Amino acid sequence: MHGILSLAALHLAYRHPADKPRLVCIAAYHHNIALRGFQHGISQVNDGNSDALYAFSCLNMVYVLAFFGPLCDGASVDSKSRILGEGWIPAIRGVDAVLHPVYDRVCRGPLDDLTKIGNWDQLNPDQQVVTHDDHFRSIQQVWESNNDACIYDESLYLLRKCNVYMKQFETMSSEARAEWGYNQDWSAPFIWLHATSKEYLDLLQQRKPPALLIFAYFGALAHALDGSWFMEGWGRSIILVVDELLGGYYDRWIKWPKDIIRIK
């Protein structure tokens, strides 16, 4: 309940900017109570609380994205570090990590549909011709002789897989979409956040150019979700920050993400 109330307060803060400070405080109050309940529940997992714990993890992801994104006071923190995932990516992945004990139980319950990701495991971007995949593949030359090339290759492969996952819905009939279930095209960027390696995320926080470039392409996919209030501005902000940090040498590789957000 407190998780729902925290999101409701954040959404009101988004809708009524003049009252944002008060509403964000209310949201934080309820979120802290929800977190304490979550931590207590994780310590004694059972069939009776597994669905509630999983539901909170979903609510928490939306809360974190809204709090660090459209509702963040940019003057109060290092905006570049924030945009590059400091705080919000660990908050999303951290909750996911402690949920492993409840996952099997959730798959047998009423929230099973939330756990399904369709044909994700069968997708292979190397065996399919998909729009824009050439842009993703082109950036591999940036790190081809880098000691961390395997880490970058894996993260890029997963991002290309997300692109394939999203593109299949563009030609899917409404009937097929209805049968697919909950996790459709919009879920792909979040799949990547959970699937990409800690080693890659460490390199991103170190602001290594190849890691930044991959993150800009993640921003291009995230920009497709700009119509959701809690994702508003995320894709654009990521691409702009990466562009500023990389400088002119990488212009030809970051051109496509900038084209996506219509920035020259």
Predicted feature residues:
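Amphipathic alpha-helical regulatory regions
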Residues: 1-16, 29-33, 47-70, 89-95, ...
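Structured all-alpha helical bundle cores of eukaryotic regulatory proteins
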Residues: 24-39, 62-107
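Short secondary-structure subsegments characteristic of cysteine-rich extracellular domains
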Residues: 21-37, 237-249
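C-terminal effector modules of eukaryotic transcription factors
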Residues: 84-103, 107-264
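Flexible helix-coil transition and linker loops at the boundaries of alpha-helical arrays
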Residues: 40-47
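Amphipathic repeat-derived elements
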Residues: 5-7, 12-34, 72, 127-137, ...
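Residue-level recognition of alpha-helical structural elements
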Residues: 20-23, 49, 84, 235
